[in-house]
């Protein structure tokens, strides 16, 4: 896998792309001179983790003919400053999977999430080496 990052302005706005050729914009926070023209890099890590699992879960549940009308993942990461550095990596990450739909099978949803988190999602495999990753589920009937 290969990605390219290109500086867009004279501050901290960058445009990234990979083999999909879709552009993603990142930027620094305003307190360091950023302009809010893109997501923060650490936000992008959490989005990548959630997206990876979301794709797995939707793929599995489509095969099981679950009628999902709304699906979102709210992801929160707790960061901890490392001694003698300015780095603050994630140490705890929690994903809240929220579903709405018609006659959703709770067991199928829980199994799909477990398969993603424990077997399929490469982003989870990458990040769980450095952070404790947990998840919970909310299901609403429509």
Locations of regions flagged by a protein language model:
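Extended beta-strand/beta-hairpin segments
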Residues: 1-47, 58-142
